[in-house]
């Protein structure tokens, strides 16, 4: 076991080597990207040893050897939790990041700040691994905030563009809302249980834990772009493609789901939280799949598909299958990173063109990228015996056979068929048909950095699901029998999606549609969500501010109350004074007549 713990720590320490190397004489700035890529590849190979040992023995480990601080009765120590989730996730994250780093060496070649870019990516990976291996909430929070700030820096990498800055701010603001939930949960655990250690929280297992779990669900909603806090994920495509591949496919966005998986001992008997996560996940997966149907930006389609898959993971947590959700995280990382890298290869070759309507016929010019993109799309739809099938099919089978909300199940199935539609749409628009891009485009995909990185993920997309699912120890008693129609539901809805996509594609080719049609306005405008949230709220706020400034301050206080009131009082006085004509005889006579009449009346009454 000493070797197990040592190698686990060596894996984490290897990643800090490129940062420490900068203080040595042998450091050459021009080779820095190579240092980072090599360090990550070594870390991946090293991490496989403790992972194999763990699969063989099934022995969990907690490394806790540095006392950190004591607050009254709370003792915090720096501790790493090497359990099933962290031991399986570390090699997957390192393998995917290794490929993305190699891809970045090609994609960001001409960037003047490439060393800083690699530093940011490396720090991002380190904070993600801190989050995954953390054994207490405080350490987990450091990793949580780390991936948040690194995403902000990387999305806004091209800071000269207003869109990139807006997207980065949007990401950090939506994550802030989620962080409020995390901090509330931490505060609740501290005040009620006086501990932040995961073991102690699970051991005490408080019965009234709805409050912190809702906080954690809010945190997961912000970080994993669930419905309500989802708009930042498609906007984050403003960053460079390697950033999209790393942040929005395999690591950062699954942090929210990972948090809920970590807390599954508290959620497994809490039906209230399970219902919330199930319904939230089902709404997310359907809504974002609908939005993906009519997008034209290749990266935005893949971003919405990521959000849709995150909704599916949320559904899995809602039906009390955390291990299955984790399996989907691991399998999804391979083909989603590869899809982003293929789109990056196409964008780079077509002079930064992202609109799929301006592509077409790329299967001849870019055969390797085409192969990878088709395999990735099929893996995403859950094609049998590709990586996605091993988790996606199981999730839908589990949802079919569990006591679940029928509406949530129906929404998930519709979203699954939509997945097939938008995947087919990318293939038809970008790869098949006639070329619709300018003829003088210099297409070249013969760079070994590009080919090798995509090749590794392609192999992962073919075999990783089989390997990972066969190395998972069974956690609950499996369903022994199942009606064949429930077993084949996932496949049937996917095939339906493919048929529908072919039909729509045929109609589009033959110009049967009248553009713009109201039928897909909801999808094109992203469900009116940005219009309402990003336009209406600031408009109401600004108009209210304007009204209060102009009406309340100017018109009422500075005009009506002070100057106008004074002038009105003076006008009244001056009117009174000017009405005095100075006719003294007439005034005396009027007094006299009044006195005489009153005396006569007085005497008369006597």
UniProtKB/Swiss-Prot annotation:
Biological processes per GO annotation: electron transport coupled proton transport; mitochondrial electron transport, NADH to ubiquinone; mitochondrial respiratory chain complex I assembly
The keyword Aminoacyl-tRNA synthetase belongs to this UniProt entry's keyword annotation: no
Entry keyword annotation includes Acetylation: no
Listed GO CC annotations: mitochondrial inner membrane; respiratory chain complex I
Bilayer-crossing regions: 4-24, 43-63, 87-107, 117-137, 140-160, 171-191, 213-233, 241-261, 273-293, 310-330, 366-386, 413-433, 457-477, 482-502, 582-602
One Pfam assignment: Proton_antipo_M
Membrane topology label: Multi-pass membrane protein
Molecular function terms from GO: NADH dehydrogenase (ubiquinone) activity
N-formylmethionine modification, residue list: 1
Superkingdom per UniProt: Eukaryota
Subcellular compartments: Mitochondrion inner membrane
Chief localization: mitochondrion
Keywords: Electron transport, Formylation, Membrane, Mitochondrion, Mitochondrion inner membrane, NAD, Respiratory chain, Translocase, Transmembrane, Transmembrane helix, Transport, Ubiquinone
InterPro entries (UniProt xref): NADH_DH_su5_C (IPR010934), NADHpl_OxRdtase_5_subgr (IPR018393), ND/Mrp_TM (IPR001750), NU5C-like (IPR003945), Proton_antipo_N (IPR001516)
Enzyme Commission code: 7.1.1.2
Reaction it catalyzes: a ubiquinone + NADH + 5 H(+)(in) = a ubiquinol + NAD(+) + 4 H(+)(out)
Family: Belongs to the complex I subunit 5 family.
Subunit structure: Core subunit of respiratory chain NADH dehydrogenase (Complex I) which is composed of 45 different subunits.
NCBIfam families linked: NDH_I_L
Function, in words: Core subunit of the mitochondrial membrane respiratory chain NADH dehydrogenase (Complex I) which catalyzes electron transfer from NADH through the respiratory chain, using ubiquinone as an electron acceptor. Essential for the catalytic activity and assembly of complex I.
Name used for this protein in its record: NADH-ubiquinone oxidoreductase chain 5
Source organism of this protein record: Bos taurus
């Amino acid at each position: 076991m000493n070797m197990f713990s040592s190698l686990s720590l060596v894996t984490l320490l290897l990643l800090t080597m490129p940062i420490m190397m900068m203080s040595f004489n042998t450091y050459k700035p021009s080779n820095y990207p190579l240092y980072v890529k090599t360090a990550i590849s070594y870390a991946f190979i090293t991490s496989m040893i403790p992972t194999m040992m763990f699969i063989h023995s099934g022995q969990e480990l907690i490394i806790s050897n540095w006392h950190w601080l004591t607050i009254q009765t709370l003792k915090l120590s720096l501790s790493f939790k090497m359990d099933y989730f962290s031991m399986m996730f570390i090699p997957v994250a390192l393998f995917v990041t290794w490929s993305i780093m190699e891809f970045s060496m090609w994609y960001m070649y001409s960037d003047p700040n490439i060393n800083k870019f690699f530093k940011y990516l490396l720090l991002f990976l380190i904070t993600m691994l801190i989050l995954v291996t953390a054994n207490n909430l405080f350490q987990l929070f450091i990793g949580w905030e780390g991936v948040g700030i690194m995403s902000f820096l990387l999305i806004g990498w091209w800071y000269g563009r207003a869109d990139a800055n807006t997207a980065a701010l949007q990401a950090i603001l939506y994550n802030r809302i989620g962080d409020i939930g995390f901090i509330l949960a931490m505060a609740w655990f501290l005040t009620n249980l006086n501990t932040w250690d995961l073991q102690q929280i699970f051991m005490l297992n408080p019965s009234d834990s709805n409050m912190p779990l809702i906080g954690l669900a809010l945190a997961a909603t912000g970080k994993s772009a669930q419905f309500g806090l989802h708009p930042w994920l498609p906007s984050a495509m403003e960053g460079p493609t390697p950033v999209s591949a790393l942040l929005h496919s395999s690591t950062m966005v699954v942090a929210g789901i990972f948090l809920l998986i970590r807390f599954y001992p508290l959620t497994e008997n809490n039906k209230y939280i399970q219902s919330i996560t199930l319904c939230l996940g089902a709404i997310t997966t359907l809504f974002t799949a609908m939005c993906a149907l009519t997008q034209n930006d290749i990266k935005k389609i893949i971003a919405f598909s990521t959000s849709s898959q995150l909704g599916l993971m949320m559904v899995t947590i809602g039906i009390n299958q955390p291990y299955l959700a984790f399996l989907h995280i691991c399998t999804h990382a391979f083909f989603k990173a590869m899809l982003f890298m293929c789109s990056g290869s196409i964008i780079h070759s077509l002079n930064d063109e992202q609109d799929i309507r301006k592509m077409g016929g790329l299967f001849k010019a870019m055969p390797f990228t085409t192969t990878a993109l088709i395999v990735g799309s099929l893996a995403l739809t859950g094609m049998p015996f590709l990586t996605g099938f091993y988790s996606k099919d199981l999730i839908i089978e589990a949802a079919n056979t569990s006591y679940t909300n029928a509406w949530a199940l129906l929404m998930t199935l519709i979203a699954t068929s939509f997945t097939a539609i938008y995947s087919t749409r990318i293939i038809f628009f970008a790869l098949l048909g006639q070329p619709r891009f300018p003829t003088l485009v210099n297409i070249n995909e013969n760079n070994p950095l590009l080919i090798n990185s995509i090749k590794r993920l392609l192999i992962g997309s073919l075999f990783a699901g089989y390997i990972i699912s066969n190395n998972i120890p069974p956690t609950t008693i499996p369903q022994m029998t199942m009606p064949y129609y429930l077993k084949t539901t996932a496949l049937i809805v996917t095939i339906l999606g493919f048929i529908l996509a072919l039909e729509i594609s045929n109609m589009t080719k033959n110009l049967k549609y009248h553009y713009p049609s109201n039928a897909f306005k909801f999808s094109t405008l992203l469900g009116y969500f940005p219009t309402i949230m990003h336009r209406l709220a600031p408009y109401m706020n600004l108009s209210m501010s304007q009204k209060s400034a102009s009406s309340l301050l100017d018109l009422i206080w500075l005009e009506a109350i002070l100057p106008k009131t004074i002038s009105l009082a003076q006008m009244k006085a001056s009117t009174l004074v000017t009405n005095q004509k100075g006719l003294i005889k007439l005034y005396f006579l009027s007094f006299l007549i009044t006195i005489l009449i009153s005396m006569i009346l007085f005497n008369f009454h006597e």
